[in-house]
């Protein structure tokens, strides 16, 4: 009898505990998007309700490329939501910069390589599907960002490069034409007249510091690598490493990010920078937000700063801290690089960080500036060791 009584009491105890647990689960508040992003709710509620607040829709891009931003904003405002409109906004905005040859570092007629040729890199990323279309080393085709879109929409690939990318563009209806202009030719001739200085070679002979080559490898003891690297360092600056990176978000939180550039001036032919690399030049995820980068692509692409920024926001960091963290990872290894990063969460909050420049300008269009929906923002940069200046808006 006592054995049966004890068993019955034990069953009742277990049932009571189970009921209590279920009640707690059913009555616990679900994490909201705000608490997820502030890191207060454990697992991020990445599929929270949509917002139609004052921050959206929005377009944001690197540098003071105003015309590109204005066009993208106009396209986005005309939309009723949907993936196509954010894509249209980014592609047409970047295309505008290509046509205007923004700072001679986007589009045709700028940044000639060692042979005097201009080649183009571009990328489009869809934050809903995580699909990417990109081109690198594109030759004789002016519309790099539009070709990247065709890679996204008409192939199962992520990136096409070089002459094969140009052949693909021809098949898609794009015409071949020279990307060299009198200005870019003069730029190249002046460079060659000055013994091809500066350049991107190291550990070769003849000495790349005083000669145009052709070069051959020079065996170098490992202990001398840092010395040679410092001696042959190419001075990176805005006028030879600009990229337009653009993010568009509509009121339904659909996100696209895109980039376009003609790369590093006087680059070794075949060089590809960070702009067309997913996670480096740009990254977008509808569940979190997006980021775009600009600067020394050869260094930045090794660290995937745009991906780092998006993942930091996924973990709860605000955009400004996420951008800062993306650059700090680079600074652990490269104290002398130049770069900037913009991060935006899916609700339209944004921040920027920069290093190695006096300041970094970027364009923003959103309802948040009712009297000035399209506006230029700037962030002061600090060139000191392991210091990154940030702006949170």
Curated annotation (Swiss-Prot):
Top EC category: hydrolase
PTM statement from Swiss-Prot or TrEMBL: Cleaved into an alpha and beta chain by autocatalysis; this activates the enzyme. The N-terminal residue of the beta subunit is responsible for the nucleophile hydrolase activity.
Organism: Drosophila simulans
Record-listed E.C. numbers: 3.5.1.26
Keywords: Autocatalytic cleavage, Disulfide bond, Hydrolase, Protease, Signal
Origin superkingdom: Eukaryota
UniProt entry tagged with the keyword Transcription regulation: no
Family matches, as Pfam families: Asparaginase_2
GO cellular component: lysosome
Any one of the GO BP annotations: protein deglycosylation
GO molecular function, one term: peptidase activity
Protein purpose: Cleaves the GlcNAc-Asn bond which joins oligosaccharides to the peptide of asparagine-linked glycoproteins.
Assembly and oligomerization: Heterotetramer of two alpha and two beta chains arranged as a dimer of alpha/beta heterodimers.
Residues annotated as binding substrate: 271-274, 294-297
Annotated protein name in UniProt: Putative N(4)-(beta-N-acetylglucosaminyl)-L-asparaginase GD10667
UniProt record similarity statement: Belongs to the Ntn-hydrolase family.
Cystine pairings recorded for this chain: 97-102, 196-212, 354-381
Entry annotation: catalytic residues: 243 (nucleophile)
Signal peptide from the UniProt entry: 1-23
Gene3D superfamilies: (Glycosyl)asparaginase
